[in-house]
């Protein structure tokens, strides 16, 4: 049975919802050191052209060295005529299989964008190189969660930054016109990368994940956030709970949002039980960009929103001009 809106806060309250940031004291230093460590690793990229039944588009398999040596893979589709092109990096949802979605990458290329679709480490065919020093529940949300330096999403975020770097190195890409897009986990990554990377021109995030963890864990225990609930059920020590949320605070898109200055478009479904709308608005309302917009859809949950796709295309065209 579908929920009746409002499932979360009413829209009028969501628009004003601005919980305080909970950044650790060394938040800025942590990310400066993390980016420096990533930059010190060689890219070691390779590209292999593969056949694909689409006219006017060339498709390649890409591999590069991610954080701590993980082999990160993805798909690259570019228009075969009219170079140079604006670029897009596409980030996928949690445990989603990009293999079945290559057509989405190709579709962006048919719209005129040189498009790289990243396969997130461990979730598909990209490797995972950071071992967890402790047990974790099924899934990725609690792998290494007791130490920010060992946490799974540290590698994910840094791999995602390197995806922008890889795309900017392609000769057919206009380096000052690169956008990032994605839904759910991919939406969270789009916002995180916009905060942490240099050279992102525009970002679009569909119902972003990884936002306002403290509230998300309370409101969405059945989705991926539920992995954190399950970990805390099995580890009842209050000191462990405190450390879990301290680790998550380094990766909370809400805490990264004040570093976002590029144009941003965000969507939220008001009956979304996976990425509750208040968690999305918490991050959005902290974004520093003067050019930002959010679309709230009253009758949609955690699902593709057809009307937003047109909004997304228009927003990207205005800022990237393919």
Labelled PLM ranges:
Residues 1-57, 322:
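N-terminal targeting or regulatory segments adjacent to alpha/beta-hydrolase or S9 domains
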Residues 74, 78, 84-94:
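Short beta-strand element of the alpha/beta-hydrolase
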Residues 99, 105-158:
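Cap/lid segment of the alpha/beta-hydrolase catalytic domain
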Residues 172-183:
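Alpha/beta-hydrolase fold nucleophile elbow
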Residues 191-239:
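Hydrolase active-site cap/lid region
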Residues 260, 266-268, 272:
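Short beta-strand/loop motif that positions the catalytic acidic residue
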Residues 270-275, 302-303:
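Acidic catalytic loop of the alpha/beta-hydrolase fold
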Residues 281-322:
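C-terminal catalytic histidine-bearing segment of alpha/beta-hydrolase fold enzymes
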